[in-house]
Amino acid sequence: MQTNPVELPPSADGNPRAAAPSSAPYNGPAVRVALLLPLDSQALAQPAEAVRAGFMAAHQLQPEGVTVNLVPTGDSAQAALDAYRGAAEQNDIVVGPLARSAVASLATSGAVNKPTIALNHPQVNSPLPRQMLVIGLSLEDEARQVAEWAASEQPVGQALVLTGRAAWQQRLAGAFSQRWAELGRSQATVELPAEGGYVDGNALAELRARLSSEPPQLVYAALDANGLRQVRMSVGTSLPTYGTASVNPGLDPASVAAELAGVRFLDLPWTVQPDHPAVAGYPRWSAGGQGLDPQRLYALGIDAYRVARELAQRPNGAFELDGATGRLSVNMGQGERAFRRVETGVVVRDNGPTDQILTDDAGGDSVPPPRRVFEPVSTGL
């Protein structure tokens, strides 16, 4: 089944839309790409649609030489595996599956006989198939990169890791702590229970006492933006504080709490730098609602198409892309396939009230430009 295109609306300000990120003109053979997504799954249809929309937005802007065939699947890993076998017979490259269990099933099936771009990280003990490249977004990769970034900026001293009881918080805290230890650094972990969106008051009081008696060099927050806001309201904002995409409060200046000013975190260019050249040329996606997670999956779809397009031209080479999800490095050499994503580092700006008034060339007053929520910073990654 061939996919439907995504319409490219005009930019929000009415000006011509920025050019799509430049790539070398397509000079490979005509290629058929199967997009294998759980669009028939009750649980995963919405995430799958976000990926599909991003993939097709990228294809519509750079369609030369590439035919996309959509292969919808259901919930089960076996259904995805059966669909993969059929897709591999009729296509040159397969993009998918999306579900972690389906990727794991495929990775251990022996069925991978075409270049395959998996959209999630399988939890398997055996090496991945030679023709499988995994490009899914990873909480753990983010946390490890934040550890490297923080270590480069804070070369001495202990890190205090703040986490909650949710599984994703534990994963972030564990990945940061492991990488921090590998870098030869010391850390302590404090768990902050929360219920109904509110961090436990007794835990915050204990944290204040701890910081007073044993101040760390920095804080790593495996929390969401709301939890981190409550922590900083309680203990102050003086300590250097790092996080991953989970602490992103969104791009609306009015919704960013003052307590988050100065927090440094990694996230996708798509969600923190809408004017970045790798992002601005693509249509924004509104069908996923206001949450950031659907937007991240849409950006993953954009980059999945771009990686597939490059792979068609350089099946055994190495290449880099300035993508919607970060700076991508792919090596398709004779050894194990390698993929690395480096996300954008930003600091939350202080967007408090201002009386700034600009004067135009005619001497009249004009409205100040929109204030940016995030300031990109060098991470050294």
PLM features per residue range, with description:
Residues 232-302:
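Extracellular/periplasmic periplasmic-binding protein-like sensory domains
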Residues 100-106, 217-235:
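Hydrophobic alpha-helical
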